[in-house]
């Protein structure tokens, strides 16, 4: 078993997330919303804590018991960079919600601190293109979380150009083969980002439902704001309102029970999917195929460990209760399922291919 990734190596990607990305995010959140002195002081306190020991959740937190089961009793009080990177990163976002009063009494309860960023991305989207084939929609869904780099859904295969060439693994044929095996069944989609990524996810769901390639789509989103742009139920509704005729069809599909939105607490857990609870395991086990979207879900699917890139995908996902596909733009160091020649060619160009968002994969 490969070692769990921690963030204690200066200059490493995890270290940069903890010591550079998180402080920058606190500053952005502080500036994006007119929080009062108390909330600003709490944000400043969280910023000061990053170089020290992990603090506890706010007194009276309703989910304290849940986080204790997820490891807080073991990790609170220890330095941030000495605990598993996945755990520290997830817990940071939970603590950020405490700092802005998301769960507490007062005017900021339930106010998404990332809403200004999500709204700006959604407002910048071009109108959805009608009539795209499933393969084009699949690639649009894959590359959607590069929207911060200026990528947009484009019409037809020609518009995919550069994006397709960045694939380090492409088992899209295997994905369609699994989906078309037997009678149309349930497709589970574990969403990643809102806005530019969620919209093509929904357009793909609409196309598959309309073509009767699936009988229903179960869309898993986050129960509360998480990792800045991760999709919540509110983000689903916002996208449907921007999706034109497809949005109207999906709105009706939700009313009919053919599109089901679920926000399971484990979606925000700081743990790999190997530790999923039984009810979530039953959800995935009932599906013809589960599609895991994005970088974080990939890390949770295969395990946030120092795997050799040639480790077989099937080996590290063998625990999953049904067929599972990963659609992911590479934005962290974890990757498996590549052949030696591909790894050698990519490494020859430097290590940034793992983290720069310039490459992607489709694995089944």
At which residue positions do the language-model features occur?
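Histidine-anchored nucleotide/phosphate-binding helix
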Residues: 196-218
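C-terminal functional extensions of proteins
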Residues: 6, 221-223, 229-364
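Gly/Ser/Thr-rich loops at beta-strand to alpha-helix junctions
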Residues: 83-87, 190-199, 224-226, 295-300
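Conserved structured core elements
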Residues: 16, 86, 169, 198-202, ...
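Catalytic-core regions built around general acid/base machinery
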Residues: 178, 204-211, 279, 283
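Structural motif
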Residues: 186-188, 288-289
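Non-catalytic accessory regions outside enzyme or core folds
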Residues: 1-186, 363-364
């Amino acid at each position: 078993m490969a070692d769990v990734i921690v963030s204690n190596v200066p200059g490493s990607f995890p270290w940069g997330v903890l010591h550079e990305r998180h402080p920058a995010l606190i500053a952005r959140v502080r500036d994006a919303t007119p929080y009062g002195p108390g909330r600003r002081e709490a944000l400043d306190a969280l910023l000061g804590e990053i170089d020290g020991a992990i603090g506890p959740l706010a007194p009276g937190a309703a989910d304290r018991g849940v986080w204790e089961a997820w490891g807080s009793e073991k990790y609170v009080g220890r330095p941030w960079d000495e605990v598993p990177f996945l755990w520290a990163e997830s817990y940071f976002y939970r603590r950020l919600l405490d700092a802005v009063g998301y769960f507490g009494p007062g005017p900021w309860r339930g106010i998404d601190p990332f809403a200004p960023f999500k709204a700006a991305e959604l407002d910048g989207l071009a109108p959805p293109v009608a009539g795209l084939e499933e393969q084009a929609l699949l690639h649009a869904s894959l590359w959607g979380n590069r929207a911060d780099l200026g990528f947009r859904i484009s019409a037809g295969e020609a518009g995919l150009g550069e994006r397709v060439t960045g694939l380090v693994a492409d088992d899209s044929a295997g994905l369609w083969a699994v989906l078309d095996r037997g009678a149309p069944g349930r497709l589970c989609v574990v969403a990643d980002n809102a806005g530019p990524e969620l919209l093509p996810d929904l357009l793909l769901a609409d196309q598959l439902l309309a073509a009767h390639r699936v009988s229903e789509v179960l869309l898993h989103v986050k129960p509360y704001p998480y990792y800045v742009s991760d999709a919540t139920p509110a983000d689903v509704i916002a996208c449907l309102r921007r999706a034109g005729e497809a949005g109207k069809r999906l709105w009706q599909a939700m009313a009919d029970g053919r599109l089901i939105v679920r926000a399971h607490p484990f979606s925000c857990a700081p743990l790999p999917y190997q530790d999923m609870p039984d009810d979530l395991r039953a959800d995935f086990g009932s599906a013809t195929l589960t599609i895991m979207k994005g970088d974080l879900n990939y890390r949770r699917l295969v395990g946030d460990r120092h795997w050799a890139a040639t480790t077989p995908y099937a080996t590290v996902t063998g625990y999953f209760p049904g067929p599972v596909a990963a659609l992911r733009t590479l934005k962290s160091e974890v990757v498996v399922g590549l052949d030696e020649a591909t790894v050698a060619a990519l490494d020859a160009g430097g290590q940034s291919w793992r983290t720069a968002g310039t490459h992607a994969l489709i694995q089944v």
